[in-house]
Amino acid sequence: MALTTSNEFKTGAIAPDFTLVNTVDNSLLSLTEAKGEKGTVLLFICNHCPFVIHVNTALVQMANEYQAKGINFIAISSNEIENYPQDGPELMQQVAKEQNYPFPYLFDETQAVAKAYDAACTPDFYVFDKALKAVYHGQLDDARPENGKPVTGQDIRNAMDHLLENKAVLENQKPSVGCGIKWR
């Protein structure tokens, strides 16, 4: 599996708005509608990437914990599906149900949202404050498939905890690592 690291997304940048199909219930959902009262975590993921599969359980646990605190999670898959049909909307819905995703799983068919965020890999994590200003863009933690490190979500947890405690933005933000987004 080829490794791709996330691109830089400037701290303080405003999250570009979007409206996409939520594959969980086939409704249209915008960032404005789905954002959290205290913050929002945007994650670019897909069904087939081993890096995403490796952290799925932790994502569900973390989302359940932090959504109760006012930080909503929104997952987006932007992979092209002609060559990667396993990342299509029907299978996204199936994965969301099997994994018990407590968050919307949106399909970015045109890849415009991934381009607006300069997303590069799956998983790719962005944390925004209540005004949708970027406070974090980077990795979940140091765990990778087969490196033996436990999935803790420590980097994202630190960013969300700083946000909830009104502390300064974390300066040391390690890029996310995963499968490259499958562009058209």
Predicted features by range, described:
Residues 1-172, 180-184:
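Chalcogenol-based redox active-site neighborhoods
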